């Protein structure tokens, strides 16, 4: 028997109810995910996974594709019930017929069970075939009035472990404005107004990770005041980002070249935030000037 049970979520429900958004949400929560897995392959897949991966959280989308679907999935569920190494839940996504029709018309896609092309007929047949599975589901979510963002938040609230470090993490990075803004930054702060160590010959070839540069940057009164205000701004808003279901928050601090001031500020910020949150720090342009000089 495995020391740690596999936590399996089977994502199913009405076509057009949001299974694609759901599986992306599970991926953000640290689950290993697979979309559109035939029910008959689930047991074989789980046999391969047991003991071969460090990730004990799996989410599989299982879709209705034929009239034999329920019989197939029922056999799978019976097998899972007998497996002591797996804890599983079924997440069933539903929505009102009118909303499902509107979504299909918006995407101009055909319903997989609409043999004659009529969307509503396909929806009615699918609802009839899925009714027994819906009754077996531990989690039923009606997405009729939910935006994709709200669905992500709902899934995060129901399935994320608050102690799980995968649920929300912070990326703090430094950069140089002369090399362009980071495309993935959520929050950007500019420290170009602070005294620049570049103009001190003894500091020019060092970076904000070196003590001499760090002390030079931080020992100015305006630096300390700005840093305290920056930390005071960021810390209170982090729970809000987590509550909204955001998986990664990228905070970027920039100076002219990304070697001195921004590096010192970003690293200090990362170290302080890491006292209460999972944080990773990086310095995009820290060595760019050195590399340019060496090539010339």
Curated annotation (Swiss-Prot):
Keywords: ATP-binding, GTP-binding, Nucleotide-binding. Disulfide bonds: none annotated. Pfam families: PapZ_C, RapZ-like_N. One of its GO terms (molecular function) is GTP binding. It comes from the Bacteria. Gene3D superfamilies: P-loop containing nucleotide triphosphate hydrolases (3.40.50.300). ATP binds at residues 13-20. Residues 282-296 have a biased composition (Basic and acidic residues). InterPro entries: P-loop_NTPase, RapZ-like, RapZ-like_N, RapZ_C. GTP binds at residues 63-66. The keyword ATP-binding applies. The keyword Nucleotide-binding applies. Residues 277-296 are annotated as: Disordered. NCBIfam families: PRK05416.1. Displays ATPase and GTPase activities. Belongs to the RapZ-like family. This is Nucleotide-binding protein SSA_0810. It comes from Streptococcus sanguinis (strain SK36).
